[in-house]
Design a protein with these regions (language model features):
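Conserved Helicase C-terminal RecA-like lobe
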Residues: 2-164, 170
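Conserved RecA-like helicase motor core of SF1/SF2 enzymes
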Residues: 134, 142-145, 169-191
């Protein structure tokens, strides 16, 4: 039908799907809302995947994908309070089981650093931690340099109640010394 598809952007959509299906369904739901409001041009679809941008469109070919998923769309995002359902994603379920095992009495008070390329994935992991009453802090591009050091210091403190340090791969960088964590999870790959 003459439409062009950017393969790399479609691959990114599939990477989000492998992180958790609600990340794709959220975009699908927002896409449908935009179409109803007439804000989306039918002739050309621009696909943008920037961290946390609520104006992102779903990748070409992903429109309507939420009807195949085991939930109503829109369960991703920072402001959402819907249950995370780690069992819907292999990676999320393994992370959940690892963290649950870490919190068992007698396991030495392990702490974990979790790195993701997508702030939306960090949103879901943060909600999972909140649902399980696991203390966590989150460092992404919105955190000032002054606050970053306070977060790092608190996480590194052995008496801290923080279990997880959620880190955006694009916000990390020079000067982060996360010696308080004895486990590291790179949640999704990057090119």
């Amino acid at each position: 039908d003459g439409k062009q598809v950017n393969c790399l952007e479609s691959i990114q959509m599939l990477m989000k799907l492998s992180n958790h299906p609600s990340l794709v369904a959220e975009h699908d739901d927002k896409s449908a809302q935009r179409q109803q409001k007439g804000k989306r041009k039918a002739a050309t679809k621009q696909v943008k995947y920037t961290d946390g941008d609520e104006n992102n469109f779903v990748a070409p070919g992903a429109d309507g994908v939420s009807k195949f998923l085991p939930f109503s769309s829109g369960s991703g995002g920072r402001g959402n309070t819907a249950p995370v359902h780690p069992e819907w994603s292999g990676k999320m379920f393994v992370l959940y089981r690892l963290m649950k095992e870490m919190r068992k009495p007698g396991n030495g008070g392990d702490k974990i650093v979790i790195i993701s390329n997508y702030t939306q994935t960090l949103d879901l992991i943060g909600r999972m931690c909140r649902e399980s009453s696991w203390g966590f802090c989150r460092l992404d591009g919105s955190v000032t340099m002054k606050k970053r050091q306070k977060m790092v210091d608190e996480f590194n403190d052995p008496s801290s109640s923080l279990v997880a340090f959620l880190l955006s791969s694009k916000a990390g960088g020079c000067g982060l010394n996360l010696i308080g964590g004895n486990r590291l999870v790179l949640f999704d790959p990057d090119w």
